[in-house]
Amino acid sequence: VSRVETGRRVSDPEVVARLFRALELDGAEVERLVGLVREAYALTAPRRSDAGVSFRAGAGVELARGARWVRAFEAVVVPRLLWTAEYAAAAGAGDWAGPSLEGEGRRFCVGVAEGGRRTWPGSGECMPGQLGHLLEVSRLEGVRLGVVPAHVTPRVPLHGFTVYDDAAVTVETFTREITLTGVDEVRAYGEIFEGFERAAVFGDAARALVEDAAREVRETLGFIH
């Protein structure tokens, strides 16, 4: 006894389509029924666990160059959007050509936890230039640089991430860059970013924290060398 005869769903809609074609029906009617069956199967098909996920390397740079509104947060390192070439080399990223932070109508909001100012890749000799770069970009039109003080972190920052418009999110792991495009996931990361944004200080207060870190770097490097 077949599944069709017992009223149980078959796994492939083409099985039902073949039954329609075996009946002596008008060709147009067969195609109409087949179309309805395929639509019904599509609506009830289980969502793939990897739907809306991409592992293509370099996707973040491309997204950042095309997006009008970019939000980035890092917990323990300088956000990649703001890297200098020297910082990138010390971090083992090779040649680095980040997206332009200027452009009419483009907005960037970049947050970093206070500890990120003190994480030194390599010998740390890249840090004075990197911290100086943070001060420079914080004054660019269309760029908001925020520092989340250590004592007010709204939640444990498990990893850094970047949100591009309301279209995609990139997350970097030790082994790969993950791009998420599912609507719910992009919305969730947007809400998480808003929490860090509310906790961060901006403008002169943020620059004061960066300048404090720069003084610490100079003193420490002077002591080492």
Where are these regions (language model features)?
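Amphipathic alpha-helical interface segments
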Residues: 73-105, 117-225
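Interdomain hinge/linker segments and adjacent boundary elements that couple functional modules
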Residues: 3-120, 202, 206-225
